[in-house]
Every structure is written in C-alpha cells, then in structure tokens.
Swiss-Prot record:
Binding site for putrescine: 78, 173-176, 242
Family according to the record: Belongs to the spermidine/spermine synthase family.
Limits of the PABS domain: 17-254
Keywords of this entry: Polyamine biosynthesis, Spermidine biosynthesis, Transferase
Pathway the protein contributes to: Amine and polyamine biosynthesis; spermidine biosynthesis; spermidine from putrescine: step 1/1
Protein known as: Spermidine synthase 2
MF GO annotations: spermidine synthase activity
Enzyme Commission identifier(s): 2.5.1.16
GO cellular component, one term: cytosol
CDD domains named in the record: AdoMet_MTases
Lineage: Eukaryota, Viridiplantae, Streptophyta, Embryophyta, Tracheophyta
An annotated GO BP: spermidine biosynthetic process
Record-listed S-adenosyl 3-(methylsulfanyl)propylamine binding positions: 48, 79, 103, 123, 154-155, 173
Annotated catalytic residues: 173
Amino acid sequence: MEEQGNNESAYISSILPGWFSEISPLWPGEAHSLKVEKILFQGKSDYQNVVVFQSSTYGKVLVLDGVIQLTERDECAYQEMITHLPLCSIPNPKKVLVIGGGDGGVLREVSRHSSVEQIDICEIDKMVIDVSKQFFPNVAIGYEDPRVKLHVGDGVAFLKNVPEGTYDAVIVDSSDPIGPAQELFEKPFFESVARALCPGGVVCTQAESIWLHMHIIEDIVSNCRQIFKGSVNYAWTTVPTYPSGVIGFMLCSTEGPAVDFKNPINPIDADDSHTKTRGPLKFYNSEIHSASFCLPSFAKRVIESNAK
C-alpha cells in the first residue's frame, strides 16, 4: 500500500484539483490518473484510508491508502480470473477460503460454482466490507450467498487455526506488499496455506506486475516451489487501472492428484445457470484461461529459472 496514505493532507490534496493520481514507491517515476467527478466517501479505518469516488470513465472507484483496488468498469478482469483460474482447474471444489477480498467480488465469482458447499472469507478491515456493500452492490452481492461465512480478522492468524487439509481451494485477494498485506507475501503464510489445503488442493494469490515487480515475483516463485509439491505456475491478466495495466497470479497445488492449471477441466463458461443471479461472465472464458499462462520471454526466463 502507498506510503502517502499515512499523510492524510497530502493524500487528499492529490484528488482536490479534479484528478486522482496513484503514486507509490512500488512504481517509482510514474503515476496513473483518473478524472474525479465526485468524491462519494472518505474514511479512515483502523488499518488504512478508504476513499470512493465517481470517475468520468471507469464508474465508481475504490481506493485504499491511495491505491486503486477496483473500478466498476474493469473489476471483472481481476475478480473473474483470480477465482476461476484455480476453481476451473480442479473437479468439484467444495470448500473454498478467501483471504482478503473484502469488496465481495471474489465471493460473487466463487458462488457461480454449484459444487461449492462452503465459502469462508477472512477480511481484516470491516470498513472495506461496509463501503463495498454501500457503493458497489453488484460486486458485494457475493455476501448474499448463504454458503458464505464471514470472519473479520487477520488472515494469517485465521489460517493458523484451520485444521490441516480443510480446503479444496484458497484464494488470496491481497493488496500490495506494504502495510497490512505484507505478511501475505511471506514464506510462513504460504506454509500455512499449504497446510490448510487437502491433497491436490489449489491456491491462487495476487502476484503483482511482470512489468514492475519481477524481483517480488521471483521471491514468491522461489518460496512457492519450496512449499508446494504439486504444480507452481504464474498467470496474468490485463486490468487497465492497475499499475502497468497488468496483474499476475501465482497458482500452486499441493502434493496429491495432479493439477494441470493450463487446461481447465471444470469450465464455468459452459454452465449458464449462475448467470440468472450473478449476470454473465464479462472477461473469463476457457480460452483466456489457457492463454493467461503464456509469458513474455523476459518473465519466462526468470520464472522458469526458479524451477532448476
């Protein structure tokens, strides 16, 4: 998360002239800006600054500590991919844990899978949940599913108390590795995730941008290869309002039944029963699933070198 969020006056001044500019030490020397039509909400939780504004081109925008988390226009590219890449890679997922994801978008997508019987979500910041329900009802609709059980608290602590082998899938929808999300990128956390997964279980975690964060990605890949004895893969998608316009995901499986992440065996786009309550998929399909694992050469060299 952005250090600027700790200086409230500096942060607010960045949106007063009519433009919001996202500035962070994680992407030095550049900024992405959106025109602000109206500021809808400003608050400070126990963990971070929370802002919602109406933009002129991307609809409503949720910002945490100065960093865009989602916009109404392009949230589908992130929420659908971080959810369906893992869940469409295993047969009949039944128990799913979401770490983070307080806006409810991942819940919305998990709830499309009829095989799922239990959806636990652990989000540390209740303000994010409340604000999302108020301003992003089409995203937060996931909370309305009766299979969802909300745990407000620290995801790291929650995982430590989960019985071994509980979940078929864990989805880690974290913000950037600064502030409250820092621990979600570290080795002990991945060890807890692996322990919570059943044999052949899968995890998908937000894994930064290949254009900006190859040093972070390299560390994540190295840690995951030590911990997850099944498969370790990196995929990516395009999200226009994220830094560099792309965001990546680590997809890993535990030892057990083999998981071929690149070839979905549980295609959600072949089943339209979920569209009545959740609407049609806007971004994900089986073709883009497989294509998301194709990496540019510079990233492929770094990621594959960790396999040796």
